[in-house]
Design a protein with these regions (language model features):
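Non-catalytic pre-domain segments flanking phosphatase-related domains
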Residues: 1-9, 199-211, 215-220, 227-228
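Active-site neighborhood of HAD-like aspartate-dependent phosphohydrolases
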Residues: 2-37, 41
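Generic structural signal for small/hydrophobic residues in well-ordered secondary structure
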Residues: 10-13, 46, 104, 130, ...
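Short, solvent-exposed loop/turn segments at secondary-structure junctions
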Residues: 14-15, 20-22, 107-111, 136-138, ...
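A metal-dependent, Asp-based hydrolase signature
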Residues: 41-73, 228
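Short, acidic loop-to-helix structural element flanking the phosphoryl-transfer center
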Residues: 69-103, 143
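Substrate-recognition "cap/lid" segment bordering the active-site pocket of phosphatases
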Residues: 110-160
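Acidic, divalent-metal-coordinating active-site segment for phosphoryl/phosphodiester hydrolysis
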Residues: 145, 165-178
Length: 240
């Protein structure tokens, strides 16, 4: 039996990236202040409306609510999914014969979620379910949100992998018994997941075959021409 049978994955800055245009309505630092405000957090929890959020944040940061709306719309328009990572997760799921379930867990308001769902190149069918902060009434790193997702999906924490780009969110997941991975870049995440789900023996054998004739010893990036490692590999594999 595989050690893990579920993945809880963040959406923004993991499966989706955004890049505001150079002539963005609000400077990037100002936009980040909007998105990290306590009022915005209440909006993501579904406790206030979109217009109420824009009005309050505008007063708090001395910004026009109209400019906030335009900046959010521009950011949503720039959203792109990491199709390579999505395809990788699809292949990983298929390789388990359906035993692996994949869920999304995102801090997001309902209007922004609706905008996210309109991104055309995303394969939403990869998810068995999607958990949002506006539906849960809580947001990461609040433990209430994790417990909500675990209960709704009937997940065993020790058999669930949690992926997020924010360390504080991963630490909260780990406190609930999940195996947390901090997302930094797609290639690293793929390698981590292969290590967790793949057969290490098969992976090692595949590496030997793919690199046959090039299995030299390396030290500090320098190839060392010696025979011991070659003879050891030959003895263990009986394969030239």
């Amino acid at each position: 039996m595989a050690r893990y049978d579920a993945i809880l994955c963040d959406l923004g800055d993991v499966l989706f990236t955004w890049s505001p245009p150079a002539n963005h309505t609000l400077p990037l630092n100002t936009l980040r202040s909007v998105l990290s405000s306590s009022t915005w957090f209440e909006y993501e929890k579904g406790r206030i409306s979109q217009q109420t959020c824009y009005d309050r944040v505008g007063r708090e940061l001395s910004i026009s609510p109209v400019d906030i709306r335009k900046a959010i719309e521009e950011s949503c328009a720039s959203l792109r999914c990491d199709s390579g990572l999505v395809s990788f997760l699809r292949e990983l799921k298929d390789s388990t014969g359906g035993a692996l379930r994949i869920f999304a867990m995102s801090n997001i308001s309902q209007p922004d979620y609706d905008a996210l769902r309109s991104v055309g190149d995303m394969d939403w069918s990869i998810f068995d379910d999607i958990f949002t902060s506006f539906a849960a009434g809580a947001r990461k790193p609040d433990l209430k949100f994790y417990r909500y997702a675990l209960l709704q999906a009937n997940l065993e924490p020790s058999r669930t992998i949690f992926i997020d780009d924010k360390l504080e969110n991963v630490l909260s997941a780990r406190s609930q018994g999940l195996h947390g991975l901090v997302y930094r870049e797609s290639k690293e995440l793929k390698q981590s997941l292969l290590s967790l789900f793949g057969d290490p023996i098969q992976r090692g054998q595949r590496f030997l075959k793919e690199n046959a004739g090039r299995l030299v010893s390396m030290c500090g990036g320098i190839a060392i021409q010696e025979n011991f490692a070659q003879l050891l590999i030959l003895e263990m594999t009986n394969d030239r």
